[in-house]
UniProtKB/Swiss-Prot annotation:
It comes from Acanthamoeba polyphaga mimivirus (APMV). This is Putative ankyrin repeat protein L284. InterPro entries: Ankyrin_rpt-contain_sf (IPR036770). ANK repeats lie at residues 201-230, 253-284, 286-314. Keywords: ANK repeat, Repeat.
Amino acid sequence: MEFSNQLFMITGCPEQYHHKSLKTGLNILTKKSFDKYGGFILFEAKNIPPYYFGHYLRMVSLPSDRPDLIVYESKQSCRSNMVILGEIFLLSTQHTFIMLNDFGLDIKSISAQDRGKWYECIAGSNSDAIKGHFLFQKTCKASDEPNIIDVDDSNKKYKPEINHLDESNILKRAELLTTVTQSLSTGDAKMAGVIINKNDILDDILTLIIKSGNVSAFKTLINIIGLSNDQIFKIIESSFSHNQTKIYEFLESRYPQLYLESSIINGRTDIVDNLVKKGSNPIVVLHKAAECAQFDIIWNLSENSLINQNDIDIAMTIVKQRIHDILFYSDNPDVEKEQDILELLENIKLMRDF
């Protein structure tokens, strides 16, 4: 098995390993637990069984930098004593299997729709709890601390002190997220606003909506919740990182200046080029790109006729100020990028022959 290929793991609701909770991030079995039960079972997409009990699919990876990693391979799967749980998907939706098809799963013999229906069938009467738990898990961030699992330790003495919500609280919060998301999607702003304010779940709701690309819910949310510029910046960056095109296209129309600035800060050359073509001021873009040391964005402006020598001189002054600040105030005084940009700006002046 090529470990460079994407691996997946099937989990149940709640996500556990022999009654011990799993969590997003690194999970490690004690030696005794690994020897007793054989470890985490991982698959490449092409080897995921057609019918296999579970409720969720996790994208996973192996912590290959750890010397205590153990992996046993077989033809169809591998077993390991530790695993990093990544993004979570519902097995009851055909979209999950369409995604797996892109990773090599053959869905010709059993269609994505039929696979989804089978998993929905095994979910049984707890489908609401399963979907609620899924929504909660999508908002969980990976902890820096590993989750140590000892299946025989009822006192959890081997576990680091991590604050875990108990199962009832998890499901309660998941139900709140489900209710709010549904209310926002249907335009019921009043109910959503009351629940968000009462339960302090704005960040979770934003994360969930952006990851799912739910534009209608997002539009309703920002109409009832006042967002600061910092929050808008984070939302734009998050929509970039999750490649949610419809979300960041809406943000462009709603917050054009913040959208432009965030695109420059994040080095999204393709988006910045498009915004300049649509009419964004290339001089403003040049100076912000100089401030953020975005070489490619500056290079793409090198032949823009609206930029003159004075604009380039100002950009060079901005870069020199950045170099000064890095050398005198930064713990990592590396100014190679800035020196490259100064050289680029000098070359643009020569090329343009002002």
